[in-house]
Amino acid sequence: FLLCIIILRKVFSMATIKDYLNYYKDTSFNEYAFNELDNILFSELSYINWENIVSNYSSKIRLDHAINIFLGSLNDSTREGLSPFMKSNVENLKIIQNSNRYQNCFLANFRNQVDEEKQFGALCIYFNDGDVYVGFKGTDSTLVGWKEDLALAYTFPTLAQKDAINYLNEVIGWKDNTVYVGGHSKGGNLAMCAYMYSNNKVKRKVKKVFNNDGPGFRDTEYNSFQYKEMLGKLVMFVPEDSIVGVLLNSPPSFKVIKSTFNGPYEHDCNSWECFGSFFVEGRLGTLSKKFKERVDDIVNSYDDKKKEELVDTFFTILQKAGIKSFNNVSSIEWNQVLEIIKGITGIDNTTRDLFLDVFKSFINFQNKDKK
């Protein structure tokens, strides 16, 4: 029997979320309970632009109907402009749309706000006759989104964190039975923060908080009563070469997941390997450990004011070079390169090297998608 299990694990070790979708598409939540892979799928729904499809308030629309409208709104141009992660999410929508498992899911309370100071998105997914998954959107390609991510190292709460707390308190009502709160990337941090500072009525309804490769907190929040109280409900996943999920202070224990991708690209949760309704566990890689050490050295070397100055400098350099989004770094022109070189000349060596590493990874990621 043990040999059979080992063989099956070997055969199915390369399965991903898409395989899970296809295999369990005709299995209801009563037959096969909500699990960690459903959590990933629901967290991905918060990335979709449901503008003019899903209500900003409590009025609900069936998930399959919303998907049908959204897919009908896409054209070749909008599809081409999607990141690899979002292209995979759209492919998942096509399977979900025709899946009996998700036929009785409903969407409501859609939020998507981007301005000069913050990037915030959220969505409620209602399922299983009274249960709800509150999903928080992760970082998009905008500079403001990434700047707010880095602000986690010196500010609490950020504007997005404030919105997340208010949102969770607002959308959960007496009719909701079991509540799950989760998100991918920055959305995972927002999920933790929202639960930590939600009111007691909401906390009593929340069964689990999912952080899917999202960053942690500063020392102050990490050592707080609110954080320690949350740990009993927290489930955190990071891939073996995690970059985002190991930023700042992580919980004492988390699950490390194998991926079909390598390096920073493992952040794409569509690449995470699964076996049935469980992720295939691995070990934290050298890349992840070394990256965390470098970032921790910088974070611990400066006070909050200095860290804020460094982040402002980082994004001022990019803005002066005419870069408005990380989507266009692959087509950067020579005069923009010169502007960046000019901007980083006065930065200390350690910070400059980190800047170049991060910037290079974005260029490589965009080039990878074009091949």
Regions found by a protein language model. Give the residues of each.
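Alpha/beta hydrolase fold serine-hydrolase catalytic domain that processes acyl esters and thioesters
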Residues: 14-104, 108-132, 136-178, 199-371
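Catalytic cysteine-centered active loop of the rhodanese-like fold, especially the PTP/DSP P-loop
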Residues: 178-180, 193
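Gly/Ala-rich beta-loop-alpha elbow adjacent to hydrolase catalytic centers
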Residues: 183-187, 191
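Short glycine-enriched nucleophile-adjacent loop
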Residues: 191-200
